[in-house]
Amino acid sequence: GVGFKAGVKDYRLTYYTPEYKTKDTDILAAFRMTPQPGVPAEERGAAVAAESSTGTWTTVQTDGLTSLDRYKGRCYDIEPVAGEENQYIAYVAYPLDLFEEGSVTNMLTSIVGNVFGFKALRALXXEDLRIPPAYSKTFIGPPHGIQVERDKLNKYGRPLLGCTIKPKLGLSAKNYGRAVYECLRGGLDFTKDDENVNSQPFMRWRDRFLFVAEALFKSQAETGEIKGHYLNATAGTCEEMMKRAVFARELGVPIVMHDYLTGGFTANTSLAFYCRDNGLLLHIHRAMHAVIDRPRNHGIHFRVLAKALRMSGGDHIHAGTVVGKLEGEREVTLGFVDLLRDDYIEKDRSRGIYFTQDWVSMPGVLPVASGGIHVWHMPALTEIFGDDSVLQFGGGTLGHPWGNAPGAVANRVALEACVQARNEGRDLAREGNEIIREASK
């Protein structure tokens, strides 16, 4: 007789295993599935598990040469999404052996690489991943982490202040350096290259690096505080990116920056290794994230991209602002902020956290609040994000009617006032505006 039967077969026979007990070493994923009408949810969940692990659409001769039971992804639970017609959360467990050690690139290729174009699904969204310690221990993670960064900068007990230099495109290197100096001299801890400032005709990277370094050292000498500017090392090739990081180190600056999604996880992990070996902090911008995470029913939720970044490596990452958004958003944002900086995060569906995540002492990442915030948001930001955060005001610094340095002074004064008021037990939510008004005198 024949060894196996060819032909299209039901996935759920092999890949839907509701009796499966998940292992501590499994990578677990939660997918939000919107099936095409008329397709049973179990079959869809099983299909997702199969296509992102060992399955293909038919039985193949080589299946006989391996142990499917050892290597297959399993859909072990399916629950309907409350309040949504025809939408389910499918839980899939992947055996650890399916993944290359220390490669975020391979992890994402495996889990979300192919299955999102699946005809039988109208939409699919990876909501969360549980990274087991057995896997996370194969990554270096953030080059330094929150505690080491505070020690390097000698700044404690308050959020850090940043500012993106605007106009982001068109300034010459010397004028750019001047804006950096004014902001740092006024009281900010950091200034920042915009994510799309790389090396353009109006300002080549090397000139910018030189003038910025001069601004850093001058402001440091005058304020007696350690200052930084996120020099964007993102480039068209990995070699060029490393060249820029090396030059930053030679100048003796404390921090460089990378656009991790457009630059890619492979480049990002290389840069993180270099930063750890050479004492550079690494600021991460998430340009392109909304392309991937904005649709609610399709794509990858930002909490997954955030976990991936913590594994790949970065000391700061942009994480939204929360201010002025809906309450529900606030809880979800704080969920992934905790996933970035805490060591142990309990499962909590109200905050979008589908799995308990234990990072087993991998360093944390500072969340950066940036985009459309200004000095009147300071009380809310201090309360929501707490001390371990970077608050970045671009237009909210440079837009000050008296100029850049007074804008920086205003932000620093407001921050110190809010931190002091909080430490004295005042209610920032209620008295915020009053606190800012008093401080501005």
Curated annotation (Swiss-Prot):
The chain residues annotated with the modification N6-carboxylysine are K192
Pfam families of this UniProt entry? RuBisCO_large, RuBisCO_large_N
Q: For Mg(2+), which residues are the binding ones?
A: K192, D194, E195
Positions bearing the site annotation: Transition state stabilizer = K325
Question: Which biological process annotations from GO are given for this protein?
Answer: photorespiration; reductive pentose-phosphate cycle
Quote the cofactor binding remark: Binds 1 Mg(2+) ion per subunit.
What keywords does the record list, in alphabetical order?
A: Calvin cycle, Carbon dioxide fixation, Chloroplast, Disulfide bond, Lyase, Magnesium, Metal-binding, Methylation, Monooxygenase, Oxidoreductase, Photorespiration, Photosynthesis, Plastid
Q: What cellular component terms from Gene Ontology apply here?
A: chloroplast
The reaction(s) annotated as catalysed by this protein in its Swiss-Prot or TrEMBL entry are:
2 (2R)-3-phosphoglycerate + 2 H(+) = D-ribulose 1,5-bisphosphate + CO2 + H2O; D-ribulose 1,5-bisphosphate + O2 = 2-phosphoglycolate + (2R)-3-phosphoglycerate + 2 H(+)
Q: Which residues bind substrate?
A: N114, T164, K168, R286, H318, S370
Q: Where in the cell is it found?
A: Plastid, Chloroplast
**Modifications after synthesis and translation:** The disulfide bond which can form in the large chain dimeric partners within the hexadecamer appears to be associated with oxidative stress and protein turnover.
**Which GO-annotated molecular functions does the record name?**
magnesium ion binding; monooxygenase activity; ribulose-bisphosphate carboxylase activity
Record-annotated active site: K166, H285
> Could you say which EC number(s) this protein's record lists?
4.1.1.39
- Positions carrying N6,N6,N6-trimethyllysine are K5
Cofactor(s) it depends on: Mg(2+)
Similarity annotation = Belongs to the RuBisCO large chain family. Type I subfamily.
Function of the protein:
RuBisCO catalyzes two reactions: the carboxylation of D-ribulose 1,5-bisphosphate, the primary event in carbon dioxide fixation, as well as the oxidative fragmentation of the pentose substrate in the photorespiration process. Both reactions occur simultaneously and in competition at the same active site.
Subunit structure, interactors included: Heterohexadecamer of 8 large chains and 8 small chains; disulfide-linked. The disulfide link is formed within the large subunit homodimers.
What other remark does the UniProt record contain for this protein? The basic functional RuBisCO is composed of a large chain homodimer in a 'head-to-tail' conformation. In form I RuBisCO this homodimer is arranged in a barrel-like tetramer with the small subunits forming a tetrameric 'cap' on each end of the 'barrel'.
> Which HAMAP family does the annotation name?
RuBisCO_L_type1
Instruction: Write the protein's name.
Output: Ribulose bisphosphate carboxylase large chain
Please give the organism: Argyrochosma delicatula (Delicate cloak fern)
